[in-house]
């Protein structure tokens, strides 16, 4: 039983440490880093009609990316053309 618990703990530590945390410097142009604390990934900037978040100085996005150029993120958090 103790061996099984030890194996589970080691497996969990390896899985957590092997995930790559994305930051704004790691995502290519046209992408942003979005998601929760443990599940951040690079996603494309939002297009018209897609869910978005307004740009912020911290490049910290939880639910979606800012809009592509020429669009704004409306108050209801969807991209629309200017």
From Swiss-Prot:
Q: Which domain of life is it from?
A: Eukaryota
The UniProt function text for this chain reads: Non-toxic to mice and insects.
- State what protein this is by name: Peptide 1
UniProt signal peptide: 1-18
Q: Which UniProt keywords apply?
A: Disulfide bond, Secreted, Signal
Q: Which family does it belong to?
A: Belongs to the u-CNTX family.
Main localisation, per the record?
secreted
The keyword Disulfide bond appears for this protein = yes
Disulphide bridges, residue numbers = 22-33, 27-42, 32-65, 52-73, 67-79
What lineage is on file?
Eukaryota, Metazoa, Ecdysozoa, Arthropoda, Chelicerata
Compartments (UniProt record): Secreted
Q: Decide whether keyword Transferase is in the record.
A: no
Please give the tissue specificity annotation from the record for this chain. Expressed by the venom gland.
Q: Which GO terms describe its cellular component?
A: extracellular region
